[in-house]
């Protein structure tokens, strides 16, 4: 059996909770039912963006706003672009689909940087 003072304490506590719930409702009437529309930053309008940025924009502004602004998802860099037009062999060669007349193909190690292309050195 509980003590009378403890019962009074609990009853006062729950009464205070009920009074607070009546006086301070959890949902304020001042908050509008629909959110205000937020504009996408001008830097992203009509742009093709990376997948991470696209997901962030959709989360922040909504899919309809992102589509209306013309923001598109940039395609994954295709193989020819990711393997062409950069140096190889310690900056002494260049990745190309075919070596030029004054170049020879390097067949040493670490050819993964060129992918399907050839590392052409002078």
Curated annotation (Swiss-Prot):
InterPro entries: Defensin_big_dom, Defensin_big_N, Myo_ane_neurotoxin_sf. Residues 1-28 form the signal peptide. Pfam families: Defensin_big. One of its GO terms (cellular component) is extracellular region. Keywords: Antibiotic, Antimicrobial, Cleavage on pair of basic residues, Defensin, Disulfide bond, Fungicide, Secreted, Signal. Its main location: secreted. It is found in: Secreted. Residues 29-34 form a propeptide. One of its GO terms (biological process) is killing of cells of another organism. Disulfide bonds join 88-119, 95-114, 99-120. Significantly inhibits the growth of Gram-negative and Gram-positive bacteria and fungi in vitro. Belongs to the big defensin family. This is Big defensin. It comes from Argopecten irradians (Bay scallop).
């Amino acid at each position: 059996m509980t003590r009378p003072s403890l019962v009074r304490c609990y009853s006062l506590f729950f009464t205070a909770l009920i009074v607070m719930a009546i006086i301070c409702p959890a949902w304020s009437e001042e908050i509008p039912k629909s959110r205000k529309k937020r504009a996408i930053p001008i830097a992203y309008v009509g742009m093709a963006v990376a997948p991470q940025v696209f997901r962030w924009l959709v989360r922040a502004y909504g899919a309809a706003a992102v589509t209306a602004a013309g923001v598109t998802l940039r395609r994954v860099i295709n193989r020819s672009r990711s393997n062409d037009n950069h140096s190889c062999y310690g900056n002494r060669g260049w990745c190309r689909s075919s070596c030029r007349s004054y170049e020879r193909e390097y067949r040493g190690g670490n050819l993964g940087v060129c992918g399907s292309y050839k590392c052409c050195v002078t």
